[in-house]
Amino acid sequence: MFSINIEETAGCVVSAKVQANPLVTQKCHKEALKTVKKNVVLPGFRKGKAPDNIIEARYATQVEQELRRFLLRASFEALSQMCDRKPLSPKAVRSSTVDSCNAADGGVVSFLYEAFPVIPSLPWEQLNLSDPEPVKEISDEDLENGLKNVAYFFATKTPVTRPSQEGDFISLSLHVSKKGDLNSNPVAIFENKYFKISEEDMTDAFKARFLNVSTGHRVEEEIASEDIQSFLNGDLLTFTVNAVIEISSPEMDDEKARQLQAESLEDLKKKLRIQLENQAKEEHHQKRFSAAEDALAQLIDFDLPQSLLQEREEILSREKLLNARLVKYCSDSELEEQKQTLLEEAKADARKAVKLLFLTQKVFSEKELSISREELQRMMDVCSRERFGAHPPKDISNEMLQELVLAARDRLTYHKAIEAISAEKKDLEVVPS
């Protein structure tokens, strides 16, 4: 019923001509007549019951439009099901044109779209996944620092009027606005966010700004970077110190340990050590997971869809530049010096991310991995909380539910594929698909 001819170019761009035989256009013609009938009323006939010949004679233009619409839809379905180079999605179609369409003779439809990439057979023997470092051993210093963090639970937090000192916490708000624009209302980037004034928690530049300042202190900074101006839709940053808070932590003892469901201070230390050991194991596992990601991404190269690369690169570029300016607190001149490096990092990270998106799908299929209903439901709950918060709406639409299912399935597919590589770093035997 259909024949398809394609031409491929770089960036996974495909041009296709879909030829439909008369059986297809005849069926589309019947659907077109049926659709037009439903929308018109003729004297002497009930709605939708007028003879076809009368409808075709009086509404030839509308019938032709519907015929082309149905042919276009049928041709895209054929392209998605029959063609080796399937479109990524309906949104991946850059253009579609009905070149010819006749109920008796058939029709031709042209498409220009981005297709799924072609991934060669994976050379597992070349997988280079090095042995990770052993799990970190918990030292007495680690345990002592952990106890200090636990002591914060009992700390006295006192707002003070004196200037801020090393070790204090400050509550900050950050707003962006347009300088000199009286109609520009400041927009919050964050409000009442707490920072500890210390070398461990602040960059030197950020710490210098907020050491020896009092409640109510304001810092205004003009943004010279056009990139940051564009991202934030403003050119003036205003930091406001809402409070300076002195923290006084007591020494831990048996009584305080019992308040934390421990029998004694020694028992609390044992439980804390177990917790720190579990954290170290999780960090070790994450390092191994990241190493597997790197190894898979480096295993093979192939052509990638340009639009996905560009979209991911734009997102990562924005994140890296904003992080440098607002988190690492680089000046505009420092940001300009680092900009090219950051953009190159974003480009490389984007390529890696898009490669892994498709490689993990291939690994999932070749390794014959599966997702249980329980796993899918748990991941859907995670995706739902990320999108809606703790209380999702009760009347979620079918479309939104489908989005959650796809998001959850994609995450699980990615995670399971990387875990499979991490668990089997040597002698991976995969049956090619």
From Swiss-Prot:
GO MF term set: peptidyl-prolyl cis-trans isomerase activity
Protein localization: Cytoplasm
EC number, UniProt record: 5.2.1.8
Domain PPIase FKBP-type: start-end pairs: 167-250
Sorted UniProt keywords: Cell cycle, Cell division, Chaperone, Cytoplasm, Isomerase, Rotamase
Presence of the UniProt keyword Membrane in the record: no
Chief location bin: cytoplasm
Keyword Nucleotide-binding (UniProt): no
Top-rank EC class of the record's enzyme: isomerase
GO CC terms, sorted: cytoplasm
Catalytic activity: [protein]-peptidylproline (omega=180) = [protein]-peptidylproline (omega=0)
Gene Ontology biological process terms from the UniProt entry: cell division; protein folding; protein transport
InterPro entries in the record: PPIase_dom_sf, Trig_fac, Trigger_fac_C, Trigger_fac_C_sf, Trigger_fac_ribosome-bd_bac, Trigger_fac_ribosome-bd_sf, Trigger_fact/SurA_dom_sf
Family: Belongs to the FKBP-type PPIase family. Tig subfamily.
Described purpose of this protein according to its UniProt entry: Involved in protein export. Acts as a chaperone by maintaining the newly synthesized protein in an open conformation. Functions as a peptidyl-prolyl cis-trans isomerase.
Domain notes: Consists of 3 domains; the N-terminus binds the ribosome, the middle domain has PPIase activity, while the C-terminus has intrinsic chaperone activity on its own.
Protein name (Swiss-Prot/TrEMBL): Trigger factor
Organism per entry: Chlamydia muridarum (strain MoPn / Nigg)
Gene encoding the protein: tig
